[in-house]
């Protein structure tokens, strides 16, 4: 059921009691209502908007945003103007107490803005710098994030995998950046529409060298010009040596970790103006970081490859699980092509029918985990083992037998376990 007119009016009355001006409500998509108003906070007239769902019970708190402008200079205010009022609280509340929840959200937002404006007026950016990693994830840009499949701090040669969005010749280049990879070992697969572009890495010596925009400004070309004033001569030289289309990885040191921004633009050398300027946040997607977050201990610390013999319904799922663990390299062995009969049980799908199982599985795994090395052999496991000498086999961590053919699996056991040419063999399925 919808909120009564009396409760709606109580919301407006409360805003008016706080000194709110130009109060008006309007319907939003999806059954939401928003109340917009102006409020003087610490000497600044700030346009605010409170959005809530038009129901008699609320399962989530109203959202409070700065309307019609961005305030990236302020603590806890996102690039889209959203004010963080919950701080992971509010899961336990009376869903029927609409006025109480409305009042809590508005009061908390005003308190946050008051403190943030006081800090800004005093030139105090300490809170922003202390939470710079989370700050960058929420306030810098609404553009899609870039996924780093390799730790940028451990690479001297970084490349961006991009999709070229340039529509016409002789126009400023524009690219959609998808991945950031270690250039020494990774290149875009030819089957994908990616272009590899060299990345310039700029490391700031101190966190205070990161420029936070002033009030009512945002992260744009003017911000970048201010940021480059903090670069060393050597850093500026490395930046200017690159092509007209530039991709820069800005590394910001923090007490706990390094945080990163990806800046891309086309620089018109004649006018020295920036075209297609874009700033994106970086999502950590390299294996060590993800495993540390999950608390998993690696079972493959030797970094030796794992062989999967048979890439059917069982073997393909084993490959998926191993790819998401700490395995750096998989060797896939299967002589068969994908059939429609396999679709309901297989990791692959209808789009892979009539393709080699090992090739299709390799493409699917590397789409999800680009840094994973996958080597494929379209043959049966016995032929593959016969092609390997003892030294090559000793380099394998283990073989997973998922052929679904007991005579073949027994023969592998007889030849390579009983003769101790392999130390680990797993039978699945």
Regions found by a protein language model. Name each.
Residues 20-88, 100:
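Compact alpha/beta protein-protein interaction domains typified by the UBC
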Residues 65-155:
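Domain-scale recognition of soluble eukaryotic interaction modules
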Residues 134, 138-304:
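Glycine/serine-rich phosphate-binding loop and adjoining beta1-alpha1 elements at the start
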Residues 202-206, 211-214, 329, 335-344:
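Beta1-alpha1 glycine-rich phosphate/pyrophosphate-binding loop at the start
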Residues 297-337:
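Glycine-rich adenosine-cofactor-binding loop
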Residues 335-371:
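Glycine-rich phosphate-binding loop and adjoining beta1-alpha1-beta2 segment
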Residues 362-398, 403-407:
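A structured beta-alpha segment of the ubiquitous adenosine-cofactor-binding alpha/beta core
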Residues 398-429:
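ADP-ribose/adenylate-binding Rossmann-like module
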